[in-house]
Amino acid sequence: MRKSKLKKINAVILGSGGYTGSELVNILSKHPYVKIQNFGSERVLTGKGKNINDKLSLIDVVFCCLPDGEAQKFAIKNHKKVTIIDLSGDFRLKNPASYLQYYGKDHKASNLLPEATYGLTELCKNEIKKSKLIANPGCYPTSILLAIIPLISGGLINPRNIIIDAKSGFS
């Protein structure tokens, strides 16, 4: 078997105690090109846990699986030091007024919203490669887009005729 020359990506997962974070730990721990250097909760950021801020120069990417509002705090301090992939809703909306409307609170890092790249890698690979702040789409847009894009691209359905009615038993 031929060995790959690809370098492993050094990753940190913040918020690994929640559903999204624990699933990400499970997935990335089996990935051949990812080495999880640290994972934990927001305590890592406050200094109550093992602090990673001093070691960011050794990290390639930080996955933020934190409650809404917490990734903003991390990004304010670290967006120039490391690539951040936010799995919360903190950087999905470009307009701070929309964030206030949907989340009921002001965005604390609104100056970073224009820098954030939102999108699926299947559709926005080049933009995501260049970005240091990536807003991962949520479960609804991901499931819908992955299902309908091949149908639209193949000319099998007209995008003007699509109606999505999504429900969740867990949120």
Predicted regions and their residues:
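N-terminal Rossmann-like NAD(P) cofactor-binding subdomain of oxidoreductases
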Residues: M1-S171
